Amino acid sequence: MGTFKIRCKVENIVDREKSAIIPQMLVDTGSEYTWVSEHVLTKLNVSREKKDVSFVMANGQIVTRHIGFALLRYDKYFTVDEVVFAEKGDLLLLGARTLEGLSLMVDPRKKKLVASGPIPAA
């Protein structure tokens, strides 16, 4: 499929004045979660709600990270989702759950995000 990056805005879910632009976030449908720099999330006062959650990295390494809640925006789309506090050396990722919440999907030929269509209700 190839890879591509997007520009994404992250906001504190309670105080939306606290926000940051992530200029280069890798779209990764293989990652369940979205990973945002712990420095950015701390600056936005995003609380660490789940602590020491285990993740298996692409290279097989097991790491533990904290998880919080943030509002994520891309273009006219937005959703509230769990975000991983990415540490130094971790990739900044837009994961599959966030894509689903945004009602977006990957167009592999054009390497961009497109609307996924109507949301199934049943």
Describe each region flagged by the PLM.
Residues 1-122:
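Pepsin/retropepsin-fold aspartyl endopeptidases
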